[in-house]
Amino acid sequence: MKFLIDGMLGKLSRWLRIIGFDTKYLNNAIDDELIRIAFLENRILLTSDVELYRMAVAKGVDAFLIKGKTNFEKLAYLAKRFNIDLKVDENNSRCPVCGSKIKLVTKNKVKNKVPESTFKNYEKFWVCLNEECKKIYWHGSHWKRINEVLNKANTLKNSLSLEGSVENDKQ
């Protein structure tokens, strides 16, 4: 599954990348461009814009209207619709910044590229494979918060119903 996210859902793109989905985020694209790219690249268009959603569906593009105000609510609705297990898969995670694949590297590969205390305190490091990005990741203090949000979203997902909601209105 590949996603295309409009400008109103930028944070959602980061979450989807973290859990391993090929996610393109275009924050300044006009509606017609989003629809065209979603169609050409066979991506599911995610939006919170009802008008964009309806235009995409009318043009035969697979689209989903995201509900929710918080990250965990948005993730829960998306996970319910596409039967996504909201957990980090370290083998498939992508760079939350650019969307490229990340790779587990030996600790020595990041020496002098991360703060000394980080190098001393952590054993596992991942590097973005995009030559222009090359961000380095590790299980820092944010790791607990990431898992808390994903767990909360999974719990909410199990109590949701999509019946009769506008995202299922394909007319």
Where are these regions (language model features)?
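Long, charged N-terminal interaction/targeting segments
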Residues: 1-90
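Short linker/helix segments within small regulatory modules
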Residues: 112-125
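Short functional micro-motifs and their immediate structural scaffolds
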Residues: 100-104, 133-138
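Short cysteine-rich clusters marking metal-coordination/redox-active sites
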Residues: 95-98, 128-130
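GST superfamily/GST-like fold recognition
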Residues: 137-148
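Cysteine-rich micro-motifs
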Residues: 123-135
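Short metal-coordination and nucleic-acid-contact micro-motifs, chiefly zinc-binding Cys/His arrays
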Residues: 88-92, 121-124
